[in-house]
Amino acid sequence: MRILKATLAVAISMVVLDLIFLGILAKDFFDQQLGPLRAEDTVIVAAALFYVQYVAVITAFAVLPAQTLRTAALRGLGVGWLAYATFEFTNWAVIEGWPAAMVPVDIAWGLVLTSSVAAIGWLAAGAPEPARS
């Protein structure tokens, strides 16, 4: 039951926070920076595949192994760094015209988002049971 609670909390909070950030708060910035690189319409299958795998990774590597809320949030920072820095640095390296201004903004968002949803997932799931000897 803990896995289900954590997964649902991570998934719901991630979608809500990402929609607010990408669809409202940072929409103009992303549109301006990406210009013609940005698709007119979101490819729903690709977005769904990303969210499903990312929720699973956050739950498995940040939420479930954490003994405390702080540890879940810190592990979320690590997962966020790996995911968002890999994406941004790779794009910056290989896509001609990738805007350098996107790199710190998107990485910072990935850190905030992933750490936050890991903490939310941990709170929803509750602390793990103590190990039995």
Regions from the language model: what does each represent?
Residues 1-133:
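Juxtamembrane/disordered regions of integral membrane proteins
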